[in-house]
Amino acid sequence: MVFPFWQIEAIAFINKVVDFCIEHENGKVFDGWDEEMIRLIVAYHWAKQTLLVHHNADETIKGVFMWYNCNKDDGWNFINNWEPDREDGDSIFMAFLFSEGKDSFKELTKDFINKCPEVLTKNKIGLRYRSGFPKRINYSNKLFKKIINN
């Protein structure tokens, strides 16, 4: 079977993103997932256009961000159960974020707001590890101001 060039490029891109995510995984984001599961989640976000990748001038990846459109009462099960995005949902679950430094983090945040401006009017949900356990966090727009202005 011969694959079109764009498919080969897409697979190479996804593999590059997966490698970056694995390299920067701290055990709190993908929590024991194997490489194939991470590849599947990256490809899923690429296909549904909820994947941002920040590069430097030489095309080295410096940051990756993936999110879900959901409702305020959705939690980690929404992700684990592979539920489809709720396009009319009232919230955005900021699920997977890897960044090499403050500048990359800022650029990802700006790109996210540009690509998904509705984030400024929707609930923002995330998980953070506190005392060794994941805890649901509800963020405000102050988070974005703090990131961009620091």
Indicate where each model-derived feature is located.
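Short amphipathic alpha-helix that is part of the acyltransferase structural core
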Residues: M1-M37
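Acyl-donor binding region in acyl/amide transferases
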Residues: D74-F144
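A structural signal for short, well-ordered beta-strand segments and their strand-loop junctions
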Residues: L52-H55, V64-M66, K124-Y129
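A short helix-loop-beta-strand connector motif used in the catalytic cores of GNAT acetyltransferases and
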Residues: R39-A57, Y68-D74
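Glycine-rich phosphate/pyrophosphate-binding loop shared by adenosine-nucleotide-utilizing enzymes
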Residues: E59-F65, I92
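Hydrophobic, Leu/Ile/Phe/Ala-enriched alpha-helical segments that form helix-helix packing faces
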Residues: C21, E25, I41-H45, F112-L120
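Mixed-charge, low-complexity intrinsically disordered regions
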Residues: V2-F3, Q7, L143-N150
